[in-house]
Amino acid sequence: MTTTPNQGTSHAPIFDLVTDVFGTGRHKPNRTGVDTISGFSKHYTVDLQEGFPLLTTKDLSGFRWNSLIHELLWYFSGEEHIRTLREETGIWDAWADEEGHLDTAYGRFWRRYPVPEEGLAGEAWPDDGHRWMNDEGTFDQLAYVLDTLDENPNSRRLVINAWHPANAAVSTLPPCHYTFVFNVQGDELNLHLTQRSGDIALGVPFNLAAYAILAQVVAQRAGFELGSFAHTIVDAHVYCGAGERGAWYGDHLDELQSRLADVQSPDEYLDVREWLLDAAPEEADGEEDYDHVPGLLLQASREPRERPALDVADVPLEDLSFEDIVLRDYDPADGIRFAVAE
């Protein structure tokens, strides 16, 4: 059993991401019909030795934790459908058909990446008998990384990619967090994630926690200490509501940013929140909580608490189960409701 200690309390990287997008972002409509405040190419780094980085300024336990772990285990499985996953959580139901099939599934690409049946002249491709090839003629990227960490840990080719351009061009929802790279420094294993699109209120906290678990799982099996998790988000955004509510931010974003620039202490975010709720039009029936700005301002007003610890059982990756991943000493603030923009 490997444990991530709970030594740190700082969630400054995520807090800085929120305030950066609020302070420098642009109002931006998008395909969902729910507008955003969007920033370009945002980055943060978290030291995983300071504890498991599950946010404490809102509650991510209970059904949220259940969904997070079962989703990650689904990735590990390599399944292209959600028939097993939907027995535990419905977070992918909106993008699947009645039989549970998806246009794109992360784990399918992690564990079963398509390999061309016929390559062009001069190209190098593994044959069907290669150790990382599956029986169906696909490539197991995760097995490749684990074996390479054992045999050549200083490799700079420890890349896992969930993006297939031809699939993404026609997929209902191509991968958001689409490629990640492991990197060894001394006896520490680090992980860098690149994400094309990141919902700061809902998605990014899940991504941070899930990839921190992934880093711990891989480090444990490869014999390394945990290092850092780094995250680059190309379009980092905060959803700000649909209809009149979303459009209001297009006309008043400068004023919001001016008020945020004057904040001197966490509790002053509540003053900005009160002004916003008084000034902005109410969200329409059926569109409640699509505006994530008030909830994030409430979250920003809260002092972070000590990070929890995470235990992961030392079992083969293929046997890893929900019960093998245990969160300890988690004492978060109350939950905050954010609606999902689909």
Curated annotation (Swiss-Prot):
Q: What class of enzyme is it?
A: transferase
Following inactivation of the gene, the phenotype reported is:
Thymidine auxotrophy.
Q: Where does dUMP bind?
A: R31, R156, R157, R196, S197, G198, D199, N207, H237, V238, Y239
Annotated catalysed reactions:
dUMP + (6R)-5,10-methylene-5,6,7,8-tetrahydrofolate = 7,8-dihydrofolate + dTMP
Q: Where is the active site?
A: C176 (nucleophile)
Q: What is its EC number?
A: 2.1.1.45
Tell me the compartments it is located in.
Cytoplasm
- Residues at which (6R)-5,10-methylene-5,6,7,8-tetrahydrofolate binds: D199, A341
**Biological pathway:** Pyrimidine metabolism; dTTP biosynthesis
The alphabetized list of GO BP terms reads: dTMP biosynthetic process; dTTP biosynthetic process; methylation
Q: Which InterPro entries match?
A: Thymidate_synth/dCMP_Mease, Thymidate_synth/dCMP_Mease_dom, Thymidate_synth/dCMP_Mease_sf, Thymidylate_synthase
Gene Ontology CC annotations of this record: cytosol
- GO MF assignments: thymidylate synthase activity
Keywords, A to Z, come to: Cytoplasm, Methyltransferase, Nucleotide biosynthesis, Transferase
Write down the Pfam families for this protein, in alphabetical order.
Thymidylat_synt
| PANTHER family for the chain | THYMIDYLATE SYNTHASE 1 (PTHR11548:SF1)
Q: Please describe the quaternary structure of this protein.
A: Homodimer.
Query: What is this protein's function?
Result: Catalyzes the reductive methylation of 2'-deoxyuridine-5'-monophosphate (dUMP) to 2'-deoxythymidine-5'-monophosphate (dTMP) while utilizing 5,10-methylenetetrahydrofolate (mTHF) as the methyl donor and reductant in the reaction, yielding dihydrofolate (DHF) as a by-product. This enzymatic reaction provides an intracellular de novo source of dTMP, an essential precursor for DNA biosynthesis.
UniProt family annotation: Belongs to the thymidylate synthase family. Bacterial-type ThyA subfamily.
Q: What is this protein called?
A: Thymidylate synthase
Task: Record the organism.
Answer: Haloferax volcanii (Halobacterium volcanii)
Q: What is the lineage of its organism?
A: Archaea, Methanobacteriati, Methanobacteriota, Stenosarchaea group, Halobacteria
